[in-house]
Amino acid sequence: MQLSTDDILALYGFCQELARSAGAIILQGSKAILEQKGKQDHGVNEKKNAVDLVTEWDVRVEEYVKAKIRENYPAFSFIGEESYSAGEQNPITEIPTFCVDPIDGTTNFVHGFPYACISIGVIYQKSPIIGVVYNPFLDQLYHGLKGHGSYLVSPLHPTPLRLPLSTPGPFRSLSEAQVGVEWGSDRSKQVMEAKSRSYARLAGDGSQKGKVEGGRMIHSLRSLGSAALNFVNVASGGLDIYWEIGCWPWDVCAGVVIAQEAGGLVGGSSETPITGIVDENILTGRKYIVIRGIGDTPEETGLDAQKRLIKEFYETVEDWAPN
């Protein structure tokens, strides 16, 4: 199926409107869950373990989104977190595909921590071209279209602000970085120990005084609890790097577009060449790294700096197979 420029622009607008209307349902769900907190039937269930949560509102939002898509784009394919969990496991094909996480940051949503969002991506010719991430709690809408930039709309800035929010500066070393990481839902001994060692090397003092072997002593580690919000914070410049193993395409698809259009570089596993192209293999590979845009210097282009820092990062952390 071929899409014209006008088709893609209309699709881009549709995704933004859909995210906002779905966001209203998320807010309704948050209110309902917080009112039921402490009761036996509070609408929160477990998937594979006690920290992999799903609520009736995740399902409701996804069903609402699917219905709107069927009504407006019946020929498109659909990949969604809750549909996938229920057995609807559509592959990425040449058919234009919506890739949706109805509530990214469900644990935050359940606890009333206002960092949850809906993430809507569109894959065309097996590559992400549209990304919309909306946090209804903060009324922040991030959106990007391949080749047209990415933007933030918020109550403070009702006119779209181009991302990143400030001119990208140089980035000489990992020691200058604020890095987004997550504990995730796989709490097995192997994964916890690998993450703990990785985080210790990133944050630890590797000097003779600090004695953390391989320590990079970065500025900080941050966990927002949402892959999509980590991606858009790299796009805006609030995070320098985000790295995670274990996410799924619906977690990252929209964020990939928004980050790339802000000058970010997205890659897969440590073995995957960093080309700047996010294809099906990276989207479904469940290992992701994104680094913010970096300004050119007389000594080094921004792209060369991004690749150098990703290499330095992967020399610091450990790898493992996602469950």
Give residue spans per PLM region:
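N-terminal subdomain of lithium-sensitive/metallo-dependent phosphomonoesterases centered on the IMPase/IPPase/PAP
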Residues: M1-I103, E315-N323
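Oxyanion/phosphate-interacting regions
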Residues: Q2-G23, R197, G210-N323
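Residue-level signal for inorganic ion chemistry
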Residues: A22, I26, D58, I69, ...
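DPxDG-like acidic metal-binding loop motif
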Residues: P91-R162
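Short, Asp-centered acidic motifs that coordinate Mg2+ and/or phosphate
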Residues: I130, Q178, D240-I241
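Conserved beta-loop-beta connector loops within the AMP-binding
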Residues: H157-S173
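Short loop->beta-strand "edge-of-pocket" segments that line small-molecule binding or catalytic clefts
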Residues: P168-G225
